[in-house]
Amino acid sequence: MQRRTKIVATIGPATEDPKVMDKLIETGVDVVRLNFSHDKHEVHIKRAETARERAQAHGRTIGVLVDLQGPKIRVGKFKQGKIHLNEGDKFIIDADHPLDQGTQERVGTTYKTLPQDVSRGATLLLDDGRIALWVEQVEGTEVIGRVVVGGELSDNKGINRQGGGLSAAALTDKDRADIKVAAAIKADYLAISFPRSAADVNEARELFRAAGGLGGIVAKIERAEAVENIEEIIRASDVVMIARGDLAVEIGDAAVPPIQKRIIRLARAMNKIAITATQMLESMIENSVPTRAEVSDVANAVLDGTDAVMLSAETAKGKHPVAAVAAMDRVCRVAEQEYEATHSRHREDQTFRRVDEAIAMATMYTANHLPVRAIAALTESGATALWMSRISSSVPIYALTSHVETRRKVTLYRGVYPVAFEITSSDHAEINRSAIDELRRLGTVRDGDMVIITKGDLTGVLGGTNAMKVAMVGNLPEFPESAK
């Protein structure tokens, strides 16, 4: 059985070689992530080209996700490269201090408005929360703190404020330039780092569209303010990514698991996509097998209903990138066999405003109550397939479309598989036969299998799906005994 949960893999030095990319695609990567926090534009352009070329060579469609860096809120560099802070030490972050002249007592910062964002009593977390600094006072450009959790601090480590409250804009000048590159490479998804509200998401979408970008917008949930505004952010986005690293620093690591479950639940209820990310198989950067805790983490994300799970450093710079993808694939497949992963009561008690949405829900209800082998969703935009994918089921959904952008988009939808399909006839019976023939060619159905076909009366019309047909492969005259 095909895996329903999608795998997003970050491409970096460990995986940019075409031969390694071949192995990633063969092992099951659905979407490649390009992290614009690192490397030059031409490097990312080449990686996107390679991913698409190798996917095509394997007869597959792969999505490309561009991840913007967002605001850099970091300490500067130290003269000696690093220092060690002990509990009780006085330490100053000075917005006017030279960025490359950090000492044991003082360091500069890339975030020049830090003194305006904090006051006495605030807690600053450095290096993903490994070091905690209690703010005693703010004097001019100096944030004067006392170390409450010590440790080693090296160049360019991040700064977070416990509970949120740093006012840095979600989109920087670098991000605006990167958005134009993302549009030029026809990114299927654009991820915004550190959005605080729907306004940040809308601004990114406007800039992306103005640059010619057609892909979906991913809101990375990694600020405390984003959690407070989560419903409006989900509504404004196409996808939400639960970026658990910075999020855990701001709200506390113990708060992340219930927030993760809530975000996934809300995203599915709003017919949006959810990606679970950060440290999913972190140990595999060095080791060839995951820890038991990592296996449980991936499996629980699948059982929560996440559409996709993401690998970051594991595939970007890890020693075992292909093994990491294989491990994630294996864990997802086993988790998907559990009852809660294939059954759903999503929206059973709600009414619908659109015919195509009602058809999608009716299709999944029928598929889950008859021995249906596959669903062929003839689609222009992929909307019908998206709505279907919100219903937990073991029945695969094939999005048949002539639009390459739609095929790439659905690579992130749980349980949906893209298929290139051209409608060459206006006769509905002929279209149905062609759709079934395509499923037969893929090896997913054979004579005697039951399938569901959804389509519209008018081809080429967005939102035009208004028909659902239950059909038998091979045109058998009646249902099999098990379906009666």
Locations of regions flagged by a protein language model:
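Non-catalytic helical/linker scaffolds that mediate oligomerization, partner binding
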Residues: 1-484
